[in-house]
UniProtKB/Swiss-Prot annotation:
Reactions it catalyzes: alpha-D-glucose 6-phosphate = beta-D-fructose 6-phosphate
Protein's name in the database: Glucose-6-phosphate isomerase 2
Keyword rRNA processing attached: no
SUPFAM superfamilies xrefs: SIS domain (SSF53697)
CC per GO annotation: cytosol
Species in which this protein is naturally found: Neisseria meningitidis serogroup A / serotype 4A (strain DSM 15465 / Z2491)
Length: 547
C-alpha cells in the first residue's frame, strides 16, 4: 500500500470516527474556532470554520495532498510543464497576469512573456482607441457599442467580469452573443446601429460553429444595411490562436489578437479574450483585475497548505465529495453584480473535473467532479434553500459576500449582508425539536406537537464564507484565481487532467453529421434520434420556417 492510499484510508477511518460530531457542539467547545479557521488576503476573508472538520481532519487532508505530490504539481503548473498531458500542452494562465519585470516563463523552450506583453498591450491600445473615439466606424461615427461573440470559456469569463464590474463601466456599452439560437443575436442587434458598433469574434480555433454562425449572421446584417465587404470588416476584430483564419474571415491583421494554445478557454479571460472587459472598464481597471489574480497566484504558490486559501477550498471539497458523499455544491453570491459567477463556476469546475479517466488513461480510482450550481442571494433563499436546510441531501455552500454595495447605501446592502450571515448560521446550527416547541409555546399542546417536527432543522450543514471588502477589479481577480487554483488542486488529488474537455468534442462531431441529415437523406442513428429528426422534418414541412 503506497503513502497516498494510506492517507486516503486514514481519512475514511477518521470520517467514521467523527461523523456524529455536530458543528454547533464544535463551536460550543472551541471558542477560538473562527480565529483558527479563517484566512485573510488583502481585501478578502475566507472563513471555513462552519465545516464538518477539526484540526485533525485538516492534518489528514494536508497529508493526502503531500502524498499526491501537490507541491511538485504546483511547481509544474507554474513553470510551464505540460500538465495538460492528453493534449501535450502547458497551462500557463498564471503567466498572463504576471507583473512587468517578472522573470522568464517557458513553454516548449520559449519564453512566452514577450508575446504575452505584446498582445496585451495591443488589445489594451485598441480598447483605448474605442474608448477615446479615435477608432471610428466606416461612416466616421464614434463607436458606442461593442458585441463579443464567443461561447464557453470565450464568453462566460468576460461576461461575468463585465457584469461584476458594472459600477466601473466607462463609455461603451458591451454586449454578448453566445448561443447559436437566432433569438440570442437578434435580441442584441435590434438595439444597435451598424455604423457605431464593433463586433469581436472570439474563438481559439476560429472553427467554433456557434461563434462562426453568429459572425456570419452579423455580416449578413451589415450587407442588409448596405455595407460592402471591406466596410463591414472595419467593424470586426477577433481573438484567436489561428490568426490566419481570422484574417481570412475579413478581419484586418491589426485587429486580430492572439490566444495561446497553452491557455484553455475557461482560463482565458486574462488574455486578449478579456477585450470586452478592457472596453467596458478601461485598461487601468483591467490591470487591477490581473493584479488581484496575481496576488492570489503568489499566495497559492508560496503559502503552506494549512494556510493556503485555494488549497483549503479544494481539500474541503474533496472531504465532502469523497468521504462524506455530498450530493453537490452550491455557490451563492450575495451581490446582484456577481449573479453570473455561478455560471462561470459551473463551467470551471464541471468541465475541468468531469472526468472518469485518470491522467494515465486508466479508470479514475475515486469519485471525481461533482454537481456545482448556484444562484443570486437573496433570491435563491426563496428557491432551493429549502432543500439545503431541511432536505435529505448534503450540499455544502459557498457564500460570496461583498461588504459594501456599489450603489446607494440605504439599508438594502446591510439587509443583504445580514441575510448571508444568517443563512450560514442557520445551516450550521439548525433548530432542535425542543427549540421548535419553545417557539410554539402559545399554541395548544396538540397543535404544538403537530407543528414542531416541521419546524425542526437538522443543522450541521456546512458552508464557507468568502467576504470581500468591496467588489473591485482587484478583489474579483483574487476571487476568480482562488477558484481556478481550487479546481487544479482537486484534479491533483483525483489524478485527473483538469485542462482538457474531450466529452464536449464528441457531441460536436455528431452534430456535424446530423445538421446535414436534418434536411433529409440517409441517416443511421438509434431509434430515438431517428424519431427526433423525423419530428423536426415534420414540423419544418408544416411551418415552412427557415433553418
Amino acid at each position: 500500500m503506497n503513502a497516498f492510499t494510506r492517507a486516503w484510508y486514514a481519512l475514511e477511518r477518521h470520517y467514521q470516527d467523527t461523523r456524529h460530531v455536530l458543528l454547533r457542539d464544535r463551536f460550543a467547545c472551541e471558542p477560538d474556532r473562527f480565529e483558527r479557521m479563517h484566512e485573510r488576503l488583502d481585501g478578502m476573508l475566507f472563513d471555513y470554520s462552519k465545516n464538518r472538520l477539526g484540526e485533525d481532519t485538516l492534518q489528514l487532508l494536508c497529508r493526502l495532498a503531500e502524498t499526491a505530490d501537490l507541491e511538485g504539481k504546483m511547481r509544474a503548473l507554474r513553470t510551464g510543464a505540460k500538465v495538460n498531458n492528453s493534449e501535450g500542452r502547458a497551462a500557463l494562465h498564471t503567466a498572463l497576469r504576471l507583473p512587468d519585470g517578472a522573470g522568464a516563463v517557458y513553454a516548449d523552450g520559449r519564453d512566452v512573456l514577450p508575446e504575452i506583453r505584446r498582445e496585451l498591450n495591443r488589445a489594451l491600445k485598441f480598447a483605448h482607441s474605442l474608448d477615446d473615439g479615435s477608432y471610428q466606424g466606416t461612416t466616421g461615427k464614434r463607436i458606442t457599442d461593442f458585441v463579443h461573440i464567443g461561447i464557453g470559456g470565450s464568453d462566460l469569463g468576460p461576461a461575468m467580469c463585465v457584469q461584476a464590474l458594472e459600477p466601473f463601466r466607462r463609455h461603451i456599452a458591451v454586449h454578448f452573443a453566445a448561443n447559436a439560437d437566432p433569438a440570442c443575436l437578434d435580441e442584441v442587434l435590434c438595439r444597435l446601429n451598424p455604423e457605431t458598433t464593433v463586433f469581436c469574434v472570439a474563438s481559439k480555433s476560429f472553427k467554433t460553429p456557434e461563434t462562426l454562425l453568429n459572425a456570419e449572421a452579423v455580416k449578413a446584417w451589415y450587407r442588409g444595411a448596405g455595407f460592402s465587404e471591406s466596410e463591414t470588416g472595419c467593424h470586426f476584430c477577433a481573438v484567436s490562436a489561428d490568426t490566419e483564419a481570422a484574417q481570412s474571415f475579413g478581419i484586418a491583421a491589426e485587429r486580430v489578437f492572439a490566444m495561446y494554445d497553452w491557455v484553455g478557454g475557461r482560463y482565458s479571460v486574462w488574455s486578449p479574450v478579456g477585450l470586452p472587459v478592457m472596453v467596458a472598464v478601461g485598461g487601468a481597471r483591467f490591470r487591477e483585475l490581473l493584479a488581484g489574480a496575481h496576488a492570489m497566484d503568489s499566495h497559492f504558490f508560496h503559502t503552506p497548505p494549512r494556510r493556503n486559501i485555494p488549497v483549503l477550498m479544494a481539500l474541503i471539497a474533496v472531504w465532502y465529495n469523497n468521504f462524506q458523499h455530498a450530493d453537490g455544491q452550491t455557490a451563492v453570491p450575495y451581490s446582484h453584480n456577481l449573479r453570473l459567477l455561478p455560471a462561470w463556476l459551473n463551467q470551471l469546475d464541471m468541465e475541468s473535473l468531469g472526468k472518469s479517466r485518470a491522467s494515465d488513461g486508466s479508470p479514475a480510482a475515486c469519485k471525481t467532479g461533482g454537481i456545482v450550481f448556484g444562484g443570486e442571494g437573496v433570491n435563491c433563499q426563496h428557491a432551493y434553500f429549502q432543500l439545503l436546510h431541511q432536505g435529505t441531501r448534503l450540499i455544502p455552500c459557498d457564500f460570496i459576500v461583498p461588504m459594501t454595495a456599489q450603489g446607494v447605501e440605504d439599508g438594502r446592502s446591510r439587509f443583504t449582508v445580514a441575510n448571508a450571515f444568517a443563512q450560514a448560521e442557520a445551516l450550521m446550527k439548525g433548530k432542535t425539536l425542543d427549540e421548535a416547541r419553545a417557539e410554539l409555546a402559545d399554541l395548544p399542546e396538540a397543535e404544538r406537537e403537530r407543528l414542531a417536527p416541521h419546524k425542526e432543522f437538522p443543522g450541521n450543514r456546512p458552508s464557507n464564507s468568502i467576504l470581500l471588502e468591496r467588489l473591485t477589479p482587484y478583489n474579483l481577480g483574487m476571487l476568480m484565481a482562488a477558484y481556478e487554483h481550487k479546481t487544479f488542486v482537486q484534479g491533483v488529488i483525483w489524478d485527473i487532467n483538469p485542462f482538457d474537455q474531450w466529452g464536449v468534442e464528441y457531441g460536436k462531431q455528431l452534430a456535424k453529421t446530423i445538421i446535414g441529415e436534418l434536411e433529409g437523406g440517409t441517416s443511421v442513428h438509434d431509434a430515438s434520434t431517428e424519431g427526433l429528426m423525423a419530428f423536426y422534418r415534420e414540423c419544418r414541412l408544416k411551418g415552412g420556417g427557415a433553418a
